[in-house]
Amino acid sequence: MANDYISFVFKSLLLLIHLVFLGQHHVDSASVVKSLPGFEGPLPFELETGYIGVGEEEEVQLFYYFIKSERNPKEDPLLLWLTGGPGCSAISGLLYENGPLTMKLDVYNGTLPSLVSTTYSWTKNSSMIFLDQPVGTGFSYSRTELFNKPSDTGEAKRIHEFLQKWLGKHQEFSSNPFYVGGDSYSGITVPATVQEISKGNYQCCKPPINLQGYMLGNPITDSKIDGNSQIPYAHGMALISDELYESLKRICKGEYEHVDPYNTECLKLLEEFNECTSKLYRSHILYPLCEMTNPDCYIYRYSLSHYWVNDETVRKALQINKESIREWKRCDWSKPYTKDIISSVPYHMNNSINGYRSLIFSGDHDFEVPLIGTQVWIKSLNYAIVDKWRPWMINNQVAGYTRTYANKMTFATVKGGGHTAEYKPDETFIMFQRWINGQALYGKVKLLQKTE
């Protein structure tokens, strides 16, 4: 009997030790990364990678990259950057849009692709968290089978929980001004996340997150508004004829997204429209449409990141949890996801009422989410214009156009820009720098430097 009792106690202790170990493993999984394969020498910035568990049992493990501000991390803003998709990895933002590293554009020869420093990183004046979300994106994963698939509203809650836990482990940043940013499909999740954080600050969560505002680039906002803007945009950019445009307006009555199936004349005109535009690279209409494996194509850089991230030495350096090891994809469109926010306009309205400042910017050569639609929903908020439409300048050259509204919202175009910040990274960096510092976009700035 005594032996049975001793055996029971011993097994219980082993189980307790095992549970404590598991708890520690999932509570503290952050790692400082000093160097990365493909980059010469130590990293010239402070990088941390890790997992934060969310959900009742912390079954969802969200992977993040955190880079401290290169200026004054104790006081500079903290920015959470969400890549669109849904299902596009945070690496897209980090290596192509606004991070301190990018791929060296050499033709792949079977060896590990190289990384080089950028001169346009937003981390020059803010700390940044690049987050792999929703679950299944990048290196984020679930330790158990999920009964509820990710959704727009569900992600807003998960991201809020992630932030609370992340700041709990990084309390030195809890008083820094906090912003949420992203582009493309993040136009749905970012406004909802801002509202969720704002509600949490008032209702449930202490200490409050020092939320100040948000920014979005070429944001998907309302499928009807965004979709209906593509035809007038195509006409304005001389992609379709005046005759076709006038016929579309008259026969389809401005409704191009949800066409009456009995309106055969409209459907026929839309077929003609698609014939004119189907061979365009929609993310930037001036770029050629070609295969990702073509070294002469813009999107070849995405192939390089695929080779780099899927290298075993890179995953080891990033401290990737073995449970999440699988083939990394820049964007995985196959994951189940519920799009339960039809329009994020009401979220913008609520965030405006609550006083949060915002920056909405549009690359003016994006055919995916044309700037025309973005201007339509901004106008629907019905706020007075504070600063009239005017050019914003870099080195005495027009970099785009901008105006501001009474709800602390700034709208800006990026001249020659595309669907994401990556097409004009120098210009978007200057734009972000001015806005985050509370300056007017049309102010003065230092000379631009070129990417190394």
Curated annotation (Swiss-Prot):
GO terms for cellular component: extracellular region. GO terms for molecular function: serine-type carboxypeptidase activity. The keyword Hydrolase applies. Residues 1-29 form the signal peptide. It holds the Pfam family Peptidase_S10. Belongs to the peptidase S10 family. PANTHER family: SERINE CARBOXYPEPTIDASE-LIKE 1-RELATED, SERINE PROTEASE FAMILY S10 SERINE CARBOXYPEPTIDASE. The keyword Mitochondrion does not apply. The active site is at S184, D366, H419. It comes from the Eukaryota. It comes from Arabidopsis thaliana. This is Serine carboxypeptidase-like 6. Keywords: Carboxypeptidase, Disulfide bond, Glycoprotein, Hydrolase, Protease, Secreted, Signal. Glycans are attached at N109, N125, N350. It is found in: Secreted. Its EC number is 3.4.16.-. Probable carboxypeptidase. Disulfide bonds join C88-C331, C252-C266, C290-C297. Expressed in seedlings and roots. It is an enzyme of class 3 (hydrolase). Transmembrane segments: none annotated. The gene is SCPL6. GO terms for biological process: proteolysis.
